[in-house]
Amino acid sequence: MKKAFFILITLIGLSNPAFSQTYLGFEYNPNIPVKVGSTTLKHPWTGGINYGQFSTIDFNFDGLEDLVIFDRSGDEFILMEHTVSGALHDYKYVYKGHQHFPECRSRAAFVDYDSDGRKDLFTYGIGGIKVYRNVGNATTGLQWQLITDILQTDYSNNVSNLFVSASDIPAYSDIDFDGDMDILTFHIGGQNVEYHQNQSMELYGVPDSLVFVLKNQCWGKFSEDPNNNILFLNESAYPCENGDIPNPLRDESGRDSTNTRHSGSTLLAIDINNNGVMDLILGDVSYPNITLLMNGGTAPNTNSVMISQDHNYPSAAHPVNMEQFPAMYWEDVDFDGKKDLIIAPNARTVSENQYSVHFYKNTGTNELPEFVFQENNFLQKDMIDHGLGSIPVLVDENGDGLKDLLVANLFRYKPTLSLESVFQLYRNTGTASNPEFTLVNNDYLGLSSLGLGYRVVPAFGDIDGDGDQDLVVGQENGNLRLFTNTAGAGNTMNFSASVPLIDSNGTQISVISHAFPQLFDLNNDGLLDLIIGRKTGELTYYQNKGTASNPAFVPISSNLGKADITTAQEGYAAPHFFRENDTTHLFVGAYNGKVNYFRNIDGHLADGDTFSLFSSSFLDIDAGLYSTVFVDDINGNGLLNLFVGQDLGGIFLFEADPLSTISVEELRLEQKLLLFPNPGNQLVHIISKDGNISDLKLHGIYNMLGQKQEAELIQSTVDVSNLSTGSYYFILENKGKIEHLNFIKN
């Protein structure tokens, strides 16, 4: 039974054909090959990487270190399983790998602080560091125990949170070589590195505790220049003037506030030359390079003066040049037992997001590493990855009868310190039954030079009746523009210069901002209508009341179906209507990365009508941020494919699975809520099987005609006395999960 990656959505009705049995079951199925040039990508449908933080952990307790990437773009985990086939080691993407980890923000690093052989999790807590201990095993899998919401340290009898800025990455390392994990981090507002020594070995003789004292306010005896990335070595100004401090009082009086600079730094502590003291690699928010500081000391805790700095590290031939804010990670990523150097940006939105994982192979040893540049797109080269916020659309671009894949984006990084929005065209170089996509154009239509802004959204449809597909694009400013295809049926698309798309009154069509259009015959009259998602979360509907060759878009509703998907300040509604078994369905992508599924659409298109929300988290899909959806049977096998675009610039691919053994009865068993009494005629109580009701919401009660009934939820009770005798279904939400419960009024 495929329960790991499969959820079957079953729609059951009684008398109305619109509620006849329909299955929309999708399984993550990355089975369509994708090529760049002659190279077939190994992980095309894994979703991409923007601003990754790299660690390793044995997530399935098979003795192999797997790769975990925490991406700051949407605070999301990417899990790559270490697989072995004969002598071949490789990575395999684990769909929904994020479910193995607790929710984290800003940063995540896996370090075995208690030396039990299981790596623990260090992430951002407000003002510092939150810690989870790994208490899993091969039987239960990964399990996490929260050790502290905020790690504490002793500033000379003044215990307070060990401050680490949300933008920083500290060094978790055994600085004094005594067997427990210490921490290096920049001072809260200065240019100096603090050394927080773990007292676990000193106090208890075992490394199983996290008890810190500030051992040195100016570890390494250096400071950053407030105006550039030059470092002052052997610094004599406060707080470095006294060298090492056994356990200093945190005294801010000596600091010059005019020189306070620190706004973002990344640290990696390694004993590069194997001389028994830690050296330090630094990255800075304002500069593209990293700097190696060599420790001239002879023993930990007695002398940590840095004696040299190398701004071209790891080599003059291939120094790090990462726009912007490089961070460093020391992990074995090529399975040779030697830890390599990975460089990735640590600044959201302003950094490189397409060639953003630089791999330096360790050709030396772990004791004396030598890092040699290999590539600037480690793992990314094997994925569909086009920057930030992918938008997949299928269309036959060259008229060969095969649908091609066009990928729009929110934006991608453009050197130097700029951004651009583009379309990438993957031509279908396969067959009708065995599709294969090959990248043929990285800036289709030269979109980046047209000045249309960011997140330009394509929608295709023949709106002038000449047999070819025209193009409507939505802009971030809310405007829509029309590119008329003059190629004719069966030919490669050829577009005239764009013009504003106008409605039936000759007025330019525009919404508040971030227009997301779809051309779809919503009322099934043979004419393509226009639906537009908006940043504010609602859908705008224009019905086409013209002719096949002369469209006339008439505004009908600014809140179609009341399908408002806003869950926070912004919605970024990304609608996709499709028809299956003569029934219209609606998926809506959203800023929160979920996919909303609506039904009860046909016959409910007037302004003020309401669609039924079936799920606000369809298939538990989590795209991080900016989810988008496209549905089509790309290989003609009668099974729908689901393409999901997302924040990290790549795409998830699903296919309907009619062979699942999950039955309707099993789905009922998985329901957590019950209605009692049922049948009933007065007060109906909502009961949770596990006794846990949290943030219970009633989204509606509907009859079998799909008409919403007047009802109010008071605590966990609904008065149904005003309902007519008959069958209904309740749409309830408990702990963020939508459930549909049948009910009979007697």
Could you describe each region identified by the protein language model?
Residues 1, 82-84, 486-487, 729, ...:
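Short alpha-helix boundary/capping motifs
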Residues 1-25, 661-664, 668-669, 678, ...:
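Bacterial Sec-dependent N-terminal signal peptides
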Residues 10-15, 150, 224-225, 232-236, ...:
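Compositionally biased, intrinsically disordered low-complexity segments
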Residues 16, 417, 492, 580, ...:
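Intrinsically disordered, low-complexity coil segments
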Residues 18, 50, 704-706:
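Intrinsic low-complexity/disordered segments
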Residues 21-664:
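Beta-propeller-forming repeat regions
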Residues 666-746:
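C-terminal outer-membrane/trafficking sorting elements
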